[in-house]
Amino acid sequence: MDIQLKRGLLDVCVLAAIKNEDSYGYKIIKDMKPYIELSESTLYTILKRLETANMLLVRTVEHGGRLRKYYHITGLGLKRIEEFKEEWKEMMSIYRFVTKESDENDET
């Protein structure tokens, strides 16, 4: 898979994981695990990129004597999810076209 496409998909997956509630690194990985395998280092790179792009806000909270960063999605982050949904509709249309061509060739 193209690296830029994969990066974009992972960014949107992380945004979707915190869309409904603020979350922290370990919980994001745990919530995403049934759908996609993501290492801690990859996740924190994505979180930093999304924070820099103003799609996430970060707050630090003490939890059990340790500091934990909580991530909150911004309006820009929500907008990115909606843009992705529209882009994906187009991608699915292209996919159907490509596989239709393949299916027709298989039948001949």
Can you name each region flagged by the protein language model?
Residues E82-T108:
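Amphipathic alpha-helical dimerization/coiled-coil segments
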